[in-house]
């Protein structure tokens, strides 16, 4: 996986947050990989999904991550960290597949980057607000105005396999059609994100040592057909190695 090449510079300009135009992400229901369970949550109660593009050598990524940690409890946000892997020589925590997904979706290759609910992106670590904490709080509290609920069930069948079942019960499909980036050509998909709670890498030059919320896999479970009366599905999946 490691490719010997130059590492792109980190971004430190005070760039304002902008919309991505590629559609939203919502959800956040989760279970430990070795535990079965079922969760039903109203869309209005779902956490803000925050994707962080980072690297173990990225010193200003630490400022971004600490700001998110500081507001995590108050805002209820959930963090998912994608570690740089393409042309990477210093960070062993990423994968080419996960890094490529982030680049294909958002077009960014240099950390730090923070994306809120898939629809608003903040590049760099310099805020144009009073602080990163206040800027991130405002972005995390934006309401997507989706009405209805989502049910997610996870049933492990071995240490590395399991069955994921999902269903959504939107009160009004118009609320989904009105989401940022959604048009008549858009599709709605269910995914399982496999996340390692914390990964240790003492050699990380930004000094953290322990790196939380590491995304290890993004597995497509199936397309949700909004014209169908059955907005549900099930899939057998294999977990990626930690």
Language model features: what each stretch is:
Residues 53-68, 86-88:
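Short, thiol/selenol-centered motifs that function as redox-active sites or metal-ligating centers
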Residues 118, 122-130:
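Conserved glycine-bearing catalytic or ligand-binding loops at nucleotide- and phosphate-handling centers
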Residues 61-65, 125-127, 203:
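Short, solvent-exposed loop/turn and secondary-structure capping segments
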Residues 49-52, 78-83, 112-116:
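Structural recognition of the beta-strand scaffold that forms the well-ordered cores
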Residues 93-109, 113, 127-242:
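Short, conserved sequence motifs used for protein processing/export or organelle targeting and
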Residues 74-97:
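Thiol-based oxidoreductase modules, predominantly thioredoxin-like and allied folds used
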Residues 1-33, 40-41, 47-50, 58-59, ...:
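Secretory targeting signatures
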Residues 50, 64-69, 99, 111:
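Extracytoplasmic/secreted envelope proteins and their assembly/folding machinery
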């Amino acid at each position: 996986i490691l490719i010997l090449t130059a590492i792109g510079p980190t971004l430190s300009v005070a760039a304002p947050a902008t919309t991505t135009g590629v559609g939203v992400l919502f959800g956040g229901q989760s279970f430990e990989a070795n535990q079965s369970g079922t969760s039903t949550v109203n869309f209005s109660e779902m956490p803000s999904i925050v994707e962080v593009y980072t690297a173990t050598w990225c010193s200003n990524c630490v400022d971004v991550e600490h700001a998110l940690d500081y507001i995590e409890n108050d805002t209820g946000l959930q963090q998912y960290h994608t570690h740089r892997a393409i042309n990477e020589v210093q960070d062993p925590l990423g994968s080419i597949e996960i890094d490529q997904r982030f680049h294909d979706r958002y077009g960014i290759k240099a950390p730090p980057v923070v994306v809120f609910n898939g629809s608003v992106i903040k590049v760099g670590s310099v805020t144009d607000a009073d602080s990163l904490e206040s800027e991130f709080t405002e972005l995390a509290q934006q309401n997507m105005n989706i009405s209805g609920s989502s049910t997610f069930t996870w049933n492990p069948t071995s240490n590395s396999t399991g069955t994921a079942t999902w269903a959504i019960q939107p009160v009004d499909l118009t609320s989904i059609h009105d989401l940022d980036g959604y048009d008549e050509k858009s599709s709605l998909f269910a995914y399982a994100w496999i996340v390692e709670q914390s990964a240790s890498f003492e050699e990380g030059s930004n000094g953290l040592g322990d790196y939380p919320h590491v995304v290890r896999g993004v597995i497509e479970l199936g397309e949700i057909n909004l014209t169908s009366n059955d907005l549900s599905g099930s899939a057998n999946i294999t977990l990626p190695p930690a």
